[in-house]
Amino acid sequence: MAEKSTTTTDSPTAPVLVTGAAGHLGANLVHRLLDDGVKVRVLVRAESRNEAIQGLDVERFYGDLRQKESLRPALEGCRGVYHVAARIATIDGNRKFRREIYECNVAGTRNLLQAARESEAGRVVVTGSFSAVGYDLDNPSLPSDETMQFYPLERTMPYERSKAFVEHECWRAAAKGQDVVVATCCALMGGWDYYPSRLGRTLVDYANGKLRAYVDGGFEFVAARDIVEGHILCMSKGLSGEKYIFSTEYKTISEILDIFEEVTGIPRPAKRVPAGLMQIFAEASSLYLSHFHPSFPQRFTPGAIRLLQLCRHANTQKAQQELGFKPTTIRQAVKDAYQFHYNHRKAITNPNAKPPEQEG
């Protein structure tokens, strides 16, 4: 039975731990927590790129989710944990890649949950993926809610399967009495995107005039500020053993390109590539690259195109009614992302791209 949160450290001055703080969602979450006056610890790997947390007033702990003992120092004395870290990818990859996905996402979550329970670190909010939420097999565009079970017998990506297994680890822990909540994230758009993310790269390439064509489809997109708010709501109001879906808006690719054009001043591409043709090209190129050049970035993967063609919608009524979640707009999220890539990363080099609008 779902219960209210009962953290073991009552002091409001006790820190919270954020894993994956150097990533897109993690960086946005850390900035928001610091703005709220929360004492923040971050768990990062020493070999990772950690530009996102440079200069921030956080306690740094170095560890690896695959090594349970390395997590304990960061967890001691915490009053809550945001487990955001994950290996995200839309490729099938080779055997080594699939093993890495499993060890980082599934085994890593299991280790984190066990170490948090043993350290009495309070509630753990785990970032879930909308890709691991089920859908109507006969009509995938029907809105999916938290009750819809992931169907593993359809063609799915290793990442999708791993996030479904991550949820299983959460429910196993909750069944043993641990305080765990899952905050489900959709396609993320916003600032503090240092790596950058797939959507961030697409926006930068668009602004730099490198996006020549597009594929039809659509997906649920979430603004960084909305998914961050969702995590905080899960920590403060969520029911243990439950998951909540957070999305800002469903948008077609054509609608996203309209927003890109408005924000950047660069005309959208007129050429539309048929999805079937793009799928054939993506299958062939992904097979070759995954086996012979696994580190080469792939923009249009078979998995990404398949997801876009499903045109999946999300039902966020549970988060809105139980937690008071109020989504903003994807237009604002694109503006936030563009401002970050233009002003902070200096990644927009096209002289025809207009400067971002100033806030306020």
What are the residue ranges of the model-derived segments?
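N-terminal Rossmann NAD(P)H-binding glycine-rich loop of SDR-like oxidoreductase domains
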Residues: 14-36
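NAD(P)H-binding glycine-rich loop region in Rossmannoid oxidoreductase-like domains
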Residues: 47-54, 58-107, 115
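Conserved catalytic-site region of short-chain dehydrogenase/reductase
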Residues: 90, 129-141, 188-192, 197
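A conserved pocket-lining segment of Rossmann-fold NAD(P)-dependent short-chain dehydrogenase/reductase
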Residues: 93, 150-154, 201-222, 226
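Conserved Rossmann-fold NAD(P)-dependent oxidoreductase catalytic core, especially the SDR/UDP-sugar
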Residues: 103-159
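Substrate-positioning beta->alpha
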Residues: 111, 165, 198, 215-235, ...
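Mid/C-terminal beta-alpha module of Rossmann-like enzyme folds, strongest
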Residues: 230-298, 316, 321, 331-360
